[in-house]
Amino acid sequence: MEMRAADRARCTHLADSHKTIGMPDDTFNFEEAWARNQLPATGRRAEAHRLAGAMRRVIDHLVQVAAPEESLRAAADALEKYAERLAQYPVSRSYEGFAETANAGDINAFFDHSPIIGLANPLAPPIRLAVVDDKVIGHANFGVAYEGPPGYVHGGFLAAAFDEVLGMAQSLTGSPGMTGTLSIRYRKPTPLLTELVFEARVTKVEGRKIFTHCTVSADGVVTAEAEGLFIAVGHERFQQMAEATLAGSKREI
């Protein structure tokens, strides 16, 4: 499906420094925020990235090496002590950014906390994203911890990856949204330990409905594709959700 001219005009082209992504209560310059995120991390943020990277390596080794009992015990003892040490610090859930690309008030916070692309989140592979013209391009290399069928990426992790990359693509319309439906076609197994390329774009916009499409390929061969429907939701609604969570309650969306 081709995007209509009116829909295309709503998308942000990062080569045009004058265009911004606007929130109902704010004007968010996506290009400037993205550029800031690409700068080398420093201070506390840099150390958080370093710690998460080390934790990813621990996870990767744990699921595939036959370490002796004493080595596993020593590692577990050390990690338990460190977990107790971290627990002494106050919990910070300021919601500087939401783990949905289009709704991140602070793009650095979003990138750091996302379970898919967060550099400070050890659960993330992570996927590296870039915006090229009206497309979002993602690069990822899934390790053994993400294995489903022997030697291949678990389909559930691919689904989460599609949701994240499509979420970035729909953010280019300037309307923050949440996933309505996500349909995936697995064409063939997607290999582990291989450079994967995601390519996503908006196909059309109908009112609050944002339609998107994404493929993932390995060595130039498409292994899966996804169609995502996102429903635009005002930034103030996400702020209400954050405030409700901080207050320890839930509000109906």
Task: Explain the meaning of each model-derived region.
Residues 1-3:
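Methionine residue identity
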Residues 19-99, 103, 190-192, 203-253:
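HotDog/MaoC-like acyl-thioester-processing domains
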Residues 27, 31-39, 165-197:
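Hydrophobic beta-strand-centered segment that forms part of the acyl-chain substrate-binding groove
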Residues 73-145:
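Long amphipathic N-terminal alpha/beta scaffold segment
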Residues 131-135, 153-176:
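Active-site helix/loop of acyl-thioester processing domains in fatty-acid/polyketide metabolism
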Residues 142-156:
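Short histidine-centered catalytic/ligand-binding loop motif
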